[in-house]
């Protein structure tokens, strides 16, 4: 058995995520509570009475805190992945799992990233749209044609048949209309608070570069596959530059999954919340066994099913 652990990105968050783990696992609590933030992490993540969880400056640290907690539980259970990766924001969680960041560092960096991205998005009439069943080249041509109206790029290569475009709303809407004419089955506008993974996020990249200059990183203990490359990179010194590039560049998740297949991965554990990545795995690597983990019950079920192979 060769296991990879994948970490979810923004969009899967919901109030209450991680609460069962927090109440039942000291290891989860220690990781979750390790960061110093300027808001009440428990209140936003577990209850969210003020509706803050879907704002990126809150979403990001909440998601990473949840993921770091689950990683601590996995380590306690003796789970040792051969590879780790994350979708977008999930890359911070993957780097924590690999030993590059501490849990405290990953959560605090995610909080900083969220604020930087929210600031970069201010004043931009932005949009992101999922495009189904149109190939990369055809969609790229649609974006190129629509770019006369503003910035529009393919920002996520999720899996076969699912791409996401983003940028300035007028250009995104035009590219989506052209995509339908070119044969796309559906174009689904997404609820987002910024034009993520486009060049409009360059100011966020600049802010992150300054922050990373003051950070120290641990040695990579597990190979990480990076969003902007779609493959692993062993050179830990390049991590800051890759994260700066990631925030303003396309996420190659389909390429990442195909690379995991090439590396012999036959089991994948998705650390949620949600199961979006499991859907991508099913479409990209149909022969790979995949389980999604959001609750202790789901984790125990996966580990029990895989016990003999682990």
PLM regions with names:
Residues 1-139, 144, 190, 267-299:
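FabD-like malonyl-/acyl-CoA
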Residues 11-12, 37-42, 98-249:
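Alpha/beta catalytic cores of group-transfer enzymes, especially the acyltransferase/condensing modules
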Residues 75, 180, 258-264:
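Non-catalytic positions within long, well-ordered alpha-helices that form the structural scaffold/packing
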Residues 225, 244, 257-261, 278, ...:
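Generic hydrophobic alpha-helical scaffold/packing signal
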Residues 229, 289-310:
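Short, flexible loop segments at boundaries between secondary-structure elements
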Residues 252-253:
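Amphipathic coiled-coil/heptad-repeat helices and related helical stalk/stem segments
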